[in-house]
Swiss-Prot record:
It is found in: Secreted. InterPro entries: Aurein_antimicrobial_peptide (IPR013157). This is Maculatin-2.1. Transmembrane segments: none annotated. Shows antibacterial activity against B.cereus, L.innocua, M.luteus, S.aureus, S.epidermidis and S.uberis. GO terms for cellular component: extracellular region. Expressed by the skin dorsal glands. The lineage of its organism: Eukaryota, Metazoa, Chordata, Craniata, Vertebrata. The modification Threonine amide is found at T18. Keywords: Amidation, Amphibian defense peptide, Antibiotic, Antimicrobial, Secreted. Disulfide bonds: none annotated. GO terms for biological process: defense response to bacterium.
Length: 18
């Protein structure tokens, strides 16, 4: 769903930042 998509994006950003 859309929430899962947001979670995926947030996770990707977190991986890039860290």
């Amino acid at each position: 769903g859309f929430v899962d998509f947001l979670k995926k994006v947030a996770g990707t950003i977190a991986n890039v930042v860290t």
